[in-house]
């Protein structure tokens, strides 16, 4: 890593891309915030406790406390296993089933309260995102919202769908890249993915307009496969329990010539992603910084330099996030006043 002065200057993305190669892209929450400001919530687990419609009750919260997790996939999976064990032992206990559906319902309402509705998603915004994503070899998405998937579906021809098994199931042995296409890997799952009873991952067979409601409340088998906000150690538990998520994280750790990091802070809650990037050992990292002011830019540069201080061979390049197509202010969709603070 070349020594860099912690100054308040940022490169233009087009100029940076012209002089260096960045075939891969890592997306964080900043990419979603560039489109929909309501994605600024801190924790979906917190949102599920305060949403107006069917929030988590103290009884449901006790399930999370007992498992020492904030991740819905882990709590729902444990309850589903309890239901099956009770059935096998002919134990007549309805509480696990009731708690399962109550948690799932609270989760769905929390997601709907913060996620941009399909009806408000402009086609030209999806087209712009689609066009930029298609320029990369692999897009690693650290977000679980639907923006990237909706953008892919807008014009799917240039993208490589790896859910090739029966019923659109992920098959670890069937992942060879098809042609010169862009592959999108969802590091923390997504709202369009579900975990089957056998632990495998399936792509939901739904249209764009129905995806937000696809994991229906009354279906026991389908557990939404996304890892919501929690500690890095807690996230790794879910990742290691999924062949798809394990594959995605393993791919991020593969060597690459250059990686663009857009809207991702690589905070301690995502230490597993930082470790994978360090292991990939790219020649250069292009890191987006929002140009709030010179002091903020200097702080951000210093922060990332500390993250990679023990990897001096990785060149860090900092660019203005607003100069990147995914940070274009024209992508921002106004949030109706009725949706501002709608979760409380």
What are these regions (language model features)?
Residues 54-60, 169-185, 283-303:
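Short, flexible loop segments at boundaries between secondary-structure elements
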